[in-house]
UniProtKB/Swiss-Prot annotation:
Annotated signal peptide: none
Organism of provenance: Macaca mulatta
Taxonomic classification: Eukaryota, Metazoa, Chordata, Craniata, Vertebrata
Keyword Acetylation (UniProt): yes
Family matches, as Pfam families: IL1, IL1_propep
Protein's name according to its UniProt entry: Interleukin-1 alpha
Propeptide: 1-112
Function field: Cytokine constitutively present intracellularly in nearly all resting non-hematopoietic cells that plays an important role in inflammation and bridges the innate and adaptive immune systems. After binding to its receptor IL1R1 together with its accessory protein IL1RAP, forms the high affinity interleukin-1 receptor complex. Signaling involves the recruitment of adapter molecules such as MYD88, IRAK1 or IRAK4. In turn, mediates the activation of NF-kappa-B and the three MAPK pathways p38, p42/p44 and JNK pathways.
């Protein structure tokens, strides 16, 4: 069984959003460190673990401050008490700070549960083809094959010449380098796997060449590739809770899980 290699050395050099933000702001760094650099005198022990309310004048003399993602309220020992995501262009005011400090409900922001509107508004840039002519098998040892001109299916086969061979192209986004977006193309063709809705078959769509930049409605061509040991998962960028899946006596589709099969083995060098 081929070992899934560590891929995307190219992605390790991607800059983070914080680095991009800090270079574009003259008087105030929005890196996480800047929230802790404000100098204050020591607090009494009884004040520990209480939220610290900061006014605009204490943070900066700049009259208007904008930021991209979120701000936090922390205790004096560094423990995060509350997180709040605001508008991309919303100014921070004293009222914002008071509302966050006094809000009894803590909002936990999880990058992996980013809403569709956020992911679909991101721009993905093509890096390179990272895998050539590999085969996908599900956990029932079924192999993905062509059902017709537009659809794929899974079946137990004896001749690997019947299997669909895929190429995998890697993309990156400056806004999120924690995931691995890829595009799947049938080898030696210009047919690309395209997602639809839940329980709907994935489609094979022809494009004259691989998209160098993908955004908006075109994200249905992208999938987040995740690996766990020898298991590989392909999560739709357009529908982040749905996986490429096989289903008994059905076409390859998008599904959340059982009874569909969402984990695959990649077989390389089968030409």
């Amino acid at each position: 069984m081929a070992k899934v290699p560590d891929m995307f050395e190219d992605l390790k050099n991607c800059y983070s959003e914080n680095e991009e933000d800090s270079s574009s702001i003259d008087h105030l760094s929005l890196n996480q460190k800047s929230f802790y650099d404000v100098s204050y005198g020591p607090l009494h022990e009884g004040c520990m673990d209480q939220s610290v309310s900061l006014s605009i004048s204490e943070i900066s003399k700049t009259s208007k401050l904008t930021f991209k993602q979120s701000m936090v309220v922390v205790s004096t020992n560094g423990k995060v008490l509350k997180k709040r995501r605001l508008s991309l262009s919303q100014s921070i005011t004293d009222n914002n700070l008071e509302a966050i400090a006094n809000d009894s409900e803590e909002e936990i922001i999880k990058p992996r549960s980013a809403p569709f509107s956020f992911l679909s508004n991101m721009t993905y840039h093509f890096i390179r083809i990272i895998k050539h002519e590999f085969i996908l098998n599900d956990t029932l040892n079924q192999t993905i094959i062509r059902a017709n001109d537009q659809h794929l299916t899974a079946a137990a086969i004896h001749n690997l010449d019947e299997a669909v061979k895929f190429d995998m192209g890697a993309y990156t986004s400056s806004k999120d380098d924690t995931k691995v977006p890829v595009i799947l193309r049938i080898s030696k063709t210009q047919l690309y796997v395209s997602a639809q809705d839940e329980d709907q078959p994935v489609l094979l769509k022809e494009m004259p060449e691989i998209n160098k930049t993908i955004t908006g409605s075109e994200t249905n061509f992208l999938f987040f590739w995740e690996t766990h040991g020898t298991k590989n998962y392909f999560i739709s960028v357009a529908h982040p809770n749905l996986f490429i899946a096989t289903k008994h006596d059905n076409w390859v589709c998008l599904a959340k899980g059982l009874p569909s099969i969402t984990d695959f083995q990649i077989l390389e060098n089968q030409a």
